[in-house]
Every structure is written in structure tokens, then in C-alpha cells.
Amino acid sequence: GVSVPGGKVAETSEEVEAIAREFGGVVVVKAQIHAGGRGKGGGVKVCKGPEEAKAAADAILGMQLVTHQTGPEGQKVKKVWVEKGSNIKQEFYAGLTLDREKVRDTFMVSTEGGMEIEKVAEETREKIVKAAIDPAFGLQPFEATRLAFALGLEGKAVRKAASFFMGLYKAYTESDASLAEINPLVLTDEGDIIAVDAKINFDSNAMYKHK
């Protein structure tokens, strides 16, 4: 139930150029490191064609990308993700993590998509809506629908967002993740709800179950 744009991984700028030519139109070249905030560090480039995509890959591949989540040493970019461009109407944030104080998984959504959620929490905390999930029942459809309404969605977009949230929760629990962030979560001009970017952390104590 988690919709994503089409895309492919590449390790060279020549591969990026070929993928961009295959996709046609606008593509997004994204550095593949395990950290958020890549856009601010120059690790995400929107490109109008194959030549721009190749140039972007030349700039990103091999760079030491520093973000607010990598620390000052940064991380070296060895691969990029080439993604089909989306017709974005509105951006949101959606995330799941364990609230250690309440000892419950908590679903969070915000209308402030594309921004660092830590900054939103610090400056405009009221723009983050949270739902503590009862572990005995898991995320319920009515809770997912309530979260969709909290984003100001209407009509079919509410149903699609609720379905997306149910799918994200299922992926989060079945993979024993400790964090799942979709930022941005996008409403397209066509009325679809898709994950344009994501970050997932897994519980290292549960890795043996997935070998």
C-alpha cells in the first residue's frame, strides 16, 4: 500500500544518463546515504534531461555529503537513485517511531513536508499531529483516516492517504523497524499519494529474524 515513483540505482554518471534517457522528461538524482537532509547538502538534484542528470551525477558521486544527521565527517556517496519526476501539488511528512516514554509506537504527520522534522518540532510543534498506537490492536483504519484529515486532505485523497498509512505501518512492524520517515509524502496533481523520499532504521536486536 506504499506507493513510490519509479526509479533505478546507478553507480556511474553514464548509467545515470542512460536511465534518464530511458525515463524521459524530468528526473531526480539522489545521493544514497543513510541520513536525512541530503537536499540541503547538495545531494538531491532535479534534472530536465539526460545531460543535466549526468552532470548532477558527476557532482554527487564520490562527494563527502554532510547533513545534520551525518555529523561533520559526512558520508561518501557511492551510489545514486534516479527517480522519475512527480507532479507535486502538496508536500507532507509522515513518520513512525517508538515513543519510549509511552512505550508505544507513535504515528506522526505534518503539513510541513520537505522540511527537517526536528526543526518543525522545535519551532512549530503544533503542526505535528501524533497518534499513539495500541500494541494490542495496531493502527486501525479510523486512526489512519483521522491522520489523513489532519493533513487537510479531501475526497479520494483521504482514502488513499489512509491506505498508505496502513501500508506504512504494516511495513514498519513486519520489518521490525525502529523508525520509518516519509519526507516528503506527496499529493500529486493526479490525486495520488506517494512517498518521494524515505528513511528507515531497523532494530539491530531483531535482525536475526530477517536473515
What do these predicted ranges mean?
Residues 189-211:
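Acidic, glycine-rich loop-and-beta core segments that form the ion-binding/anion-interacting portion
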Residues 23-39, 67-88, 94, 168-172, ...:
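ATP-grasp fold ATP-binding core
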Residues 5-7, 29-58, 93, 116-117, ...:
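Glycine-rich phosphate-binding loop of ATP-grasp-fold ATP-dependent ligases
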Residues 143-185:
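A long amphipathic alpha-helix within ATP-dependent nucleotide-binding catalytic cores
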Residues 70-132:
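Hydrophobic alpha-helical hairpins/lids featuring a short glycine-rich hinge
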Residues 116-157, 161:
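Cap/lid and interdomain-hinge subdomains that line or gate substrate/regulatory clefts
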Residues 1-25, 31:
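A conserved helix-loop-beta module that forms one wall/lid of the active-site cleft
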Residues 27, 31-33, 95-100, 107-112, ...:
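Short beta-strand elements
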